[in-house]
Curated annotation (Swiss-Prot):
The protein, known as: Homoserine O-acetyltransferase
Location of the protein in the cell: Cytoplasm
Gene: metXA
Pathway involvement of the protein, from the record: Amino-acid biosynthesis; L-methionine biosynthesis via de novo pathway; O-acetyl-L-homoserine from L-homoserine: step 1/1
InterPro entries membership: AB_hydrolase_1, AB_hydrolase_fold, HAT_MetX-like
Catalytic activity: L-homoserine + acetyl-CoA = O-acetyl-L-homoserine + CoA
HAMAP family: MetX_acyltransf
GO molecular function term, any single one: homoserine O-acetyltransferase activity
One GO CC term, this protein: cytoplasm
Active site: 160 (nucleophile), 328, 358
Quaternary structure and interacting proteins, as annotated: Homodimer.
Main function: Transfers an acetyl group from acetyl-CoA to L-homoserine, forming acetyl-L-homoserine.
Organism annotation: Corynebacterium jeikeium (strain K411)
Lineage top rank: taxon: Bacteria
Amino acid sequence: MNPEFLPASGASRTVSIGDVVTEAGVTIFDAELRYFAFYDSPDGAADYAEFSAGPEPGLSPEERPIVLIEHALTGDGNAADWWADMVGPNKPIDTTRYLVLCANVLGGCQGSTGPSSPHPDGQAWGSRFPGLSIRDMVTAERQLLERVGVTKIHALIGASMGGARVLEWSLMHPEMINAALPIAVSARASAWQIGLQSSQIRFIEADPAWHGGDYYDTGEVPSHGLGQARRIAHLTYRGELEVDERFGVDPQNGENPYGPYRDPHQRFAVESYLDRQAEKLVARFDAGSYVVLTDALNRHDVGRSRGGMNAALGSCEVPTMVVGVDTDILYPLHQQEHLSRNLGDFIGMSKITSPTGHDGFLIESRQMGQALAKFLAKAEIIAEGTEGAEGTARA
């Protein structure tokens, strides 16, 4: 990586990546992506034998193998925050050994160009922001890496929507990737997923404050619609048994949902929980970005224009390990098992056992850490083999 583009560890930088042309032929002028970098000095680092796989510490950050992390739908580039148990010195993704990068996705609202960003005419893009595919996001990230001087990704890791980007990266730019790890994702959106996700979009679009997507200069925010979308989405991120065990049919403290008439202020405990999740998202995320990114998930299909899903997976040349969660109702485990049966260079699968559902990759730190350790150990072996083969060829 060009050291001129390397921010301080834990900090971010926003760079212009030029125009991005979508699959559908729409140009996003002078797009920007914001990215975070994580790296630490090995001085004084304790031995962490359980997760010891990786290059020897001591290389300067820009010389280290690069781990590129792809965040999920409403995530951001600050991977050491939302994946704090996984990213850091002497953690599974060891920042004393690797240079870890994570970019905010195109279409988002965390510093990269999206619907809330200024159009060249000075107004917000709003409804003029084009529909995106997962491939468009990868195109933007590829332009970012080219801009900052990255030519090789040692390990590509992503979950949920990030996992979809991992799969597309592997098919679009296999020459750049040493090894890949998609987590809790599928090869394409299922009809069930599209139904769930499009229903969330409809709630936002039905909010009077949406104004057809052009609400940015109105002083209004479609917070009700975004909150309703989050309530639906959050249930799909958790496990059914876990939610029932936590809340059951208990009323919220001080409220009585068993009264003679329906009263929205008299809630079950689970309703209060979902209301709180909605409030938190509304406070930090843009409804326009939520629509664009959720629509991109609906469009996800690795088989489109590649001869079908299985043919596309079979053509994948990147050594790929897969992780799934046994209680995931958003991306059920059978979808990761399908990946494992059809990927062209499949190198293993790990199953996270958890009552917490899709969010298990965030919650089950011990199991996720073990899976990452296995993957990064495999990535090292692959890299050593590649270097050996290249040396033999040169000889």
